[in-house]
Regions:
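Short phosphate-binding loop-to-helix
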Residues: 68-104, 111-114
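A short, N-terminal amphipathic alpha-helix
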Residues: 39-53
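Short, polar loop motifs at secondary-structure junctions
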Residues: 59-65
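Short acidic/polar active-site loop segments enriched in Thr and Asp
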Residues: 54-55, 101
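C-terminal catalytic/acceptor-binding lobe
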Residues: 199-228
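Hydrophobic targeting segments
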Residues: 14-18, 41, 56
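Conserved core of the sugar-phosphate nucleotidyltransferase
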Residues: 112-205
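N-terminal nucleotide-binding beta1-loop-alpha1 segment
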Residues: 2-28
Length: 228
C-alpha cells in the first residue's frame, strides 16, 4: 500500500525509538553511536521525517543523554542489562513503552536503510505487524542470522496482552531461551512455542541490522559510504 501524507494524517501513529537498557560493552548508550558521523537515533529520526512522519519520540531511562534531537523523550524504566561476557538475565520484553493509541516501536540500535524505513512507514496493518530480516540473507547483510527491527501496532490491547502471555509462558518453561521479539511474535501469531519461527512477517533484507559490538560501527561506515 502506498501511504500518502493524507493517509499519515488520517491514520495517526506515534513512532517510538526504543533506546533503553544497559549494554556493558559500550561506554555510552549504543543507540548514540555515530555511523558516518551521525548518531544512529538521529539517522532514524531523519529517515522517518523524510517519509512524512512527524510524531516521533525516544523511550529511555537515560533522558539527559537523548536531549537535543528535537523529539519527545519518554522516560521509561527498562531493566534489561547485557553483561560484557554473559547472557542477559533481565527481561527484554519490558522494553516497550506502554501505549493505548496506535504506535510503531522502532528498535533504537538498528542502522536502517532508507528503503527499510520507507517499508515500515508504508506498511499498513489492522492489528500488529512485525518487521525483521530473514534467510536467505543478502551478501550485504552483516550477520549470519536474522534480526528484528520494529513492531507496528494498531491493536495495543492485543499487543500488551501478548507480552503478558509471553512472560507467563516463559515462567512455565515453554521457550528454549529467554523470550525476545521472535517469541513475542510467535505468541501474537499463535504458532508453537518450542521452536523459533522465522516466518510470516514483513521482511527487510538489505544492510539494515542492529549493532552488537563497537566493532560493528566500522562495517556500517564502509557500507553507508557506498549504499546511501
Amino acid at each position: 500500500m502506498l501511504v500518502t501524507q493524507e493517509y499519515l494524517e488520517r491514520e495517526h501513529m506515534k513512532y517510538i525509538i526504543m533506546a533503553g537498557g544497559t549494554y556493558e560493552n559500550w561506554e555510552k548508550p549504543k543507540h548514540l553511536s555515530e555511523v558516518c558521523g551521525e548518531p544512529i537515533v538521529a539517522r532514524t529520526i531523519r529517515l522517518l521525517r523524510e517519509n512524512g512522519v512527524t510524531d516521533i519520540a525516544i523511550s529511555t531511562t537515560n533522558v539527559r543523554a537523548f536531549l537535543g534531537f528535537g523529539v519527545t523523550i519518554l522516560r521509561h524504566h527498562n531493566p534489561y542489562t547485557l553483561p560484557k561476557d554473559a547472557d542477559a538475565s533481565t527481561p527484554w520484553l519490558d522494553a516497550f513503552y506502554p501505549m493505548t493509541e496506535p504506535v510503531c516501536y522502532i528498535f533504537g540500535d538498528v542502522v536502517f536503510s532508507p528503503r527499510a524505513i520507507k517499508t515500515i512507514v508504508e506498511t499498513d496493518t489492522g492489528s500488529i505487524e512485525f518487521f525483521a530480516s530473514a534467510k536467505p540473507l543478502p551478501s550485504i547483510y552483516p550477520k549470519h542470522w536474522a534480526e528484528p527491527f520494529a513492531f507496528k501496532v494498531k491493536d495495543t490491547s492485543r499487543f500488551f496482552k501478548a507480552i503478558k502471555d509471553t512472560n507467563k509462558f516463559d515462567k512455565q518453561g515453554l521457550f528454549k531461551r529467554q523470550p525476545i521479539a521472535w517469541e513475542l511474535w510467535q505468541v501474537i501469531k499463535g504458532t508453537p512455542l518450542n521452536k523459533v519461527d522465522y516466518t510470516n512477517y514483513t521482511v527487510i533484507n538489505d544492510y539494515t541490522c542492529d549493532i552488537d559490538e563497537p566493532e560493528d560501527i566500522a562495517y556500517f561506515d564502509r557500507i553507508l559510504k557506498t549504499s546511501d
